Amino acid sequence: MWSPIPGTLMRTSSLPAVIEASGNDDWKKRKEAQSLKRLEVKKKRIERRNSLACNTSKEAAGQSPKEMNANTDKLVSSDETIVSANESHSSGKHLVKGLPPKYQATITSEDSSSAMRKKPNSAFKGTAITEEQNSSSSVPSSGEAISSVTAPSLPLLSLVPITATLGSREDQSILGRAGARANGMGDVERRMMQEMPGVFTKGLSNGSRVEGFLYKYSKGEVRIVCICHGSFLTPSEFVEHAGAGKVDNPLRHIVVSATPNL
């Protein structure tokens, strides 16, 4: 027979409460350990990024001042050598402060010694201030000025005549090319005038005169370029173009001029 279902289900068996509590504790511990590991990994990544960024910034910030200091030291040393050379050149008359003038040096070798002659350039750039010497103690002697110019400063001064000679060579080459081009144009015009002499009409009934150039003159063909229109004409057409009409011998009325028609 069918029996009705009871309203509530009764639990027949279950795990002890101690076992369930211990399982929950283990699961919580595992989750905490995983979260701690993740946090440690994140911290390590952040520390690496920060350390790399700090190293790169330190290197960039450390190299640029060194390079700037090296460049400034080089500039100061070169300025000091040039100022000392300027003082020796002035022979105790003037004391120059500020930027030194440009020099053009020429090197001549005799036996095994070389002498340098320095000439100040007319275009003086900079803010140079000259002051009269009040006492002889303020101006160094010639021996001190010569000793102040060290061996590394000599190549800097030796570069000046090289650039000056290069500039003069370039100017000479440009002038030479321009002159050759002008001479070439003159030769071309002269040759064209020799190959294409000027002609004009003469002795026509109407007395008109038309000028032109003899473009082609060979045994079988003669062509004349009219100046007024620039058209290529035969001798008979050239005479007709002058307004004389048809003539028996047109070459008798065409004269070759000795001077070119310009």
Curated annotation (Swiss-Prot):
Annotated coiled-coil segments of the chain: none
Record localization: Nucleus
Secretion signal, residue range per the UniProt entry: none
GO cellular component: nucleus
InterPro entries referenced in this protein's UniProt entry, alphabetically: Ninja_fam (IPR031307), NLS_NINJA_AFP-like (IPR032310), TDBD (IPR032308)
Xref: Pfam families: NLS_NINJA_AFP, TDBD
Chief localization: nucleus
Name by which UniProt lists this protein: Ninja-family protein 2
The keyword Cell wall biogenesis/degradation belongs to this UniProt entry's keyword annotation: no
GO biological process: signal transduction
Stated family: Belongs to the Ninja family.
Cystines in this chain: none
Region (Disordered): 49-70
Keywords annotated in UniProt: Nucleus
